[in-house]
Amino acid sequence: MTAPSLITPTIAACLAISGGVHVVIYLLNATLPLHVVGLGGSKTQVGLLFATSTTVSMILRPLVGGWVDRFGARRVMLPGVAVLLATLLLLPLAAGPAAYVALMAGLGCGNGVLATAAGVLVAQASPAARRGEALSVYFLATALSFAAGPPLGLAVYARAGIQSCFAVAAGLGAVIALLILILKAPALGTAPSQGFRWFNRRALPAAATVVCVNIGYSSIYAFLPLYALASGLEGSLGWFYVLFAICIITGRLTLRGLSDRIGRARVIVPAVTLTTLSYLVLARPPQVPALAAAAIMLGAGVAMFYPTLLALVVDRTPEAERGSAMGTLSGSFDLGSVLGSLLVGFTVERVSFAAGFYTAAIGALAGLTLFVVTERRVAVLRRSTLGV
């Protein structure tokens, strides 16, 4: 029997849409802070660039999933790409740091709407027997965008300035809009109106797991370089992030269908275990061998955890609610990053860098515990339903 095709035209378009959106976001994330500082902006304003876009995206993602259930992906994407294009066209007209901070809300809106809707459509359009593989490939596009966006933005900025960065971003936005216009997707969703619901209750246990596991994610960017500097480690840590990204990309390429074959839980538990161990290693005074081991473990854990958990949620959610469930899980990823940056930052400031990474490890361990307990309850419920 021939295996069902994985990369259909619809899924290919979703990969291109999500990849394009993330290239735009990462390109601007790498260059706007430099431009804002050059205009005399403060560090607080630089921080607000990211806080504004992340907060807007986090609020929208759970809602977007429900809208896709009700209206269909394409009808949800169209206003999202309109906001994105309008924002990209307004960026060259911004007069100062405060204007750029305000416009980041538009980028957060575009990212939250388009990336979430594209992910829901991938889950809807992929064969059930290869859903884990399809979602791993989808999130591979995000990892590749992270590898491409910042270098592209910095290269253009160095050679031609911020206005050229805006032009490149607007060009990519136009391509994204064209892809959405020709996207073949159901015109309407299947879910009836259920009133305003910001989150899906079925997805809450998985969402709580994501929040816990993601508590330490921002710390590897915010505090690891400072920890290395304070510990006397010489040289740039750029290699750490390159190795980390390579492990994510390699993991999603080589292990993309693993959970379809052996089961979701058998992939999720080792993935979160590796994540926990990586933070414990990072809590030690930074040395090159330990940092390399941590990058490999964390990259492998990140590669497999979220796509597999998302596939598990989709497996267990009625078709009419899958968009809402996926949106809830997607929003929890941003929530974990926001809460984690505050919690780990407070711990680092009041105690030490090591304590901050131990906090990240405790969060990941709490997520692992929550997942295992939830899975046991699901197993008990299934046995009782079957009368076993």
Predicted regions and their residues:
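C-terminal membrane-cytosol helix-exit motif in multi-pass small-molecule transporters
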Residues: 170-189, 370-375
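Helix-loop boundary and gating motifs at the non-cytosolic
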Residues: 9-49, 217-227, 231-233
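Cytoplasmic helix-loop-helix junction between adjacent transmembrane helices
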Residues: 105-140
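Structural signature of the two symmetry-related core transmembrane helices
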Residues: 75-89, 170, 266-280
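Helix-breaking motifs and short loop linkers at transmembrane-helix boundaries and internal kinks
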Residues: 72, 93-95, 263, 284-286
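Residue-level signature of mid-helix packing/kink "hotspots" within the transmembrane helices
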Residues: 54-62, 146-147, 248-249, 253, ...
